[in-house]
Structures are given as structure tokens and as C-alpha cells.
Amino acid sequence: MNLDHFGPDTITFAGSLEAKLAAVRAAGFTQIMLSAGDIVGHPEGEQAAIAAVRASGLRVTGLQVLRDFEGLSGHLHAYKVDVARAMLEMCHALGAQVLLACSSTSRHATGDPEQLARDLSKLALLAVPLQIRIAYEALSWGRHVNEFPQAWNVVQSADRANLGLALDSFHIFATSTGLGALREIDARKVYLVQLSDFMWQETRSPEDRIETARHFRVFPGEGVHSEQVAEFVRALDGMGYRGDYS
């Protein structure tokens, strides 16, 4: 396992973008996962944020997160397409080769599997000219897709070369999804793995998962699922995953 494939996420740090970049470099990491908020919220503007990232010398693992894209229609869908285009352009400017898209939580979104696949197929096609991959993640409180086997089914149905999965240990443990389901996934279609833990054994409702994710998520080794995190990483390594971790 190559330690250069590990890098932190800016949403885990306080302070300015420049301070986060400096801290990551000082800790010996070579890459960083960026939040769009770090870029658009920079006090000197988006171009200054992009320049700071480039000057840091850190490789950008990916950009997060496109929310509530799939399953909408009409003006809502058109709006989300515009948001996706803007985020893809931001990825391109930052040198990020992966855009993280999480499963929809919108009450307006349909759960029709065919439409979900069509929408993600469209998103992947938008990313092709910029040579960006889409990593689709099952949020544990997603409205229709909340476990990674469901996300994998949608990705398979969409059948685009640049559309794959993001696997997040928090969401997997929050829904108590068995790791055995990883055996059904093609390791080449896993584009990103995110590692974190939380402070208790289970979360019993979507609301509980949201609260836990926002206020009680901790680094691997600091929560109550340390053995499961290690098992998760070993399983990924065993199935041939050689991509990035954040």
C-alpha cells in the first residue's frame, strides 16, 4: 500500500485555505481532498484560491461535493446541471481528476433506478471533455440510495467509463452494511475511499446519522470501529484497490 495515496480532507481543519495547505504539507502528505467551499469562499476570490492550491505543490485528490444531482426533473434538474458544469470547471482549474457526487437527499427526487442511471450517465458525459471521473457515494441518509451496493447498481446501469464509486467507511458503518458486498464490486471502478469513524456503535435513523456525521465523526483509530476500519482497508487492498484514500 502506497502511503502517498493517503491525504486529508480540508473540511477536517479550521482556518484559512492557505493554513490548511501548509499544515498538510508540514505533516508530510503529498495530496489533499478539497471542498468547493474552500475555493468559492476564499476572501480574495476563486482565482486566488486556485493559485494557492497550485503553489502548495499538493496533488488534489478530488473536489467535493456535488449534492442532490440525480432524480430531479424540469427546472430543478437544469439548475443542478449548471451547478455540475461549474464544479467540473473548478475541478479542471485545480487539477482535480475526481468530482465526488453523493446520493440525493431531496424530497423532490424520484427513486426510479432508470432515471437515476440516466442522470448519472449525463453527469459523466459532462465530465468527459475535461477528463474528470465522477465518484458516486451512497450517503447513509440518502433518500433512495443509502448503501454502497445500491450505488454500485446505479453505476453499473449507467455504464460510463468515467463513472465509479466513492466508498466512505462512516456511511458503511452507519448503515451496518456488510463488507462482504465489496466482493461484488470491480476495484477498477472505485475512484475514491474516505476513512473516518464515529463515537458509538450504531446510528438508528437518518437524522441520527446526520447529527453523528456533522458533530461526532472522528479520525480512524479514534472511534469505536477501529477493527472494522482496518478490515475495510484490508478488504479493499485484497480486491486490488490501488487508488486514493482521504
Positions of predicted regions on the chain:
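A short, acidic, amphipathic alpha-helical segment used as a generic capping/interface helix at domain edges
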Residues: 223-238
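Short acidic/histidine-rich active-site segments
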Residues: 244-246
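Short, conserved clusters of charged catalytic residues that mark active-site
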Residues: 16-19, 44, 118, 149, ...
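N-terminal pre-domain/capping segments
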Residues: 1-97, 128, 164, 190, ...
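Short, contiguous strand/loop micro-motifs
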Residues: 6-8, 35-37, 73-75, 109-111, ...
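Active-site acidic/histidine proton-transfer and metal-coordination neighborhood
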Residues: 18, 70-165, 174, 242
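Short, hinge-like loop/turn segments at secondary-structure boundaries
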Residues: 24-25, 49-52, 78-81, 117, ...
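Acidic/histidine-rich catalytic cores of soluble enzymes
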Residues: 32, 63, 122-222, 226
